[in-house]
A protein has these predicted regions:
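Ferredoxin-reductase
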Residues: 2-95
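FNR/FR-type flavoprotein reductase catalytic core
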Residues: 2-5, 51, 80-135
């Protein structure tokens, strides 16, 4: 799988799901359609450290492919987490984020011939939400 290029996305909507959980909708204006497979993730490059590789934070895509250029992230505020603190305190509607993806292989098989069980906790539901809504 080829490494995806870094892209710019604009936050077009933010929803406080709970006191420490937010949904962020990100539009990729340079693309007519943002393609991904349910279960994949994006990596954000956040300005939280001077070393590049310490700025990267990966989050599963919570939305499902709908043919648009918008995707959704479901993020919980982690105590002491630099990335989530930045997202919760600095990012507003209209903010620009740098990201890479979609990437990852935690996806459904091409053909499902048996019942599948999806087990998770907390915001670990994000990739499963994408999968279930896609099915």
């Amino acid at each position: 799988m080829a490494i995806q290029p870094w892209r710019k996305g604009k936050v077009i909507k933010i929803d406080d799901h709970t006191h420490n959980t937010r949904r962020f909708w990100i539009e990729v204006a340079e693309l007519e359609r943002f393609d991904f497979i349910p279960g994949q993730f994006v990596t954000l490059d956040l300005p939280i450290h001077e070393k590049v590789n310490k700025r990267w934070r990966s989050y599963s895509i919570a939305s499902w492919p709908d043919g648009s250029n918008v995707f959704e992230l479901l993020i919980v505020l982690a105590e002491g987490g630099l990335g989530t603190a930045y997202l919760f305190n600095e990012i507003t509607v209209g903010s620009e984020l740098t990201f890479r993806g979609a990437q990852g292989v935690f996806t459904l098989p091409g053909t499902i011939e048996k019942d599948i069980f999806l087990i998770c906790t907390g915001t670990g539901i994000a990739p499963f939400r994408s999968m279930v809504n896609y099915l």
